[in-house]
Amino acid sequence: GIIPEPIGGIPGNFAMVGVFEKGKADVKFTARSTGGHASAPTANTPIARLSAFVTDVEKHAPFRKKFLPEVTAMFTRLAPYAPFGLRLVMGNLWLFAPLMKVVLPRVSAQAGAMLRTTIAFTMQSGSDAYNVLPQEATLGANMRFIPHQGEQESLAIIRRLAEKHGLEMEVVHTNDYSEPVDIHGEAFRQVERVIGETFPGLPVSPYVMTGATDAQFYQP
């Protein structure tokens, strides 16, 4: 798609060509106990365990950050259009990659998601009353898998953390990432040529699809 300012600080319009799509999963975590009345709360209640699990994941960021070739190519192509300081960093990832791994997720959630598997906690349920300790509390999350830590490895990492906090984990739905396109191949070059003929002068760059599309159904 044609995207204005694809990364914060880089002005202008760019033709961003999706070259792979992250996988995704919907995951449910359940904590159980005997329940009880809020006037005499027990230790380590279901909601407390779920909260400790969320804090653990958010604080320790269990997924590995990496500049995949497609992401490196994106930064290299966008670098000439960035202000000097940003251009210097983006055009020399061989030197600044460790710094960018730390800074990028803080500057742009979208760009940060291109470096690693992500998990977002989205749903929660517990007791139906303020004064009742739940016998069961649940937590829902959405995961997006990156190629260097795909579906199986990413789910295994989260499962280990869930078990550490005494939680059950159910994978409600999952599918792995789509295979990356060869950004140096003829198919990608042909797309570039068509964009150049249709929109003369518009910069073209590979792009990571962090959201889900129907692209997975077109894989051989």
Descriptions of predicted regions:
Residues 2-220:
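Metal-dependent amide/peptide-bond hydrolase catalytic core
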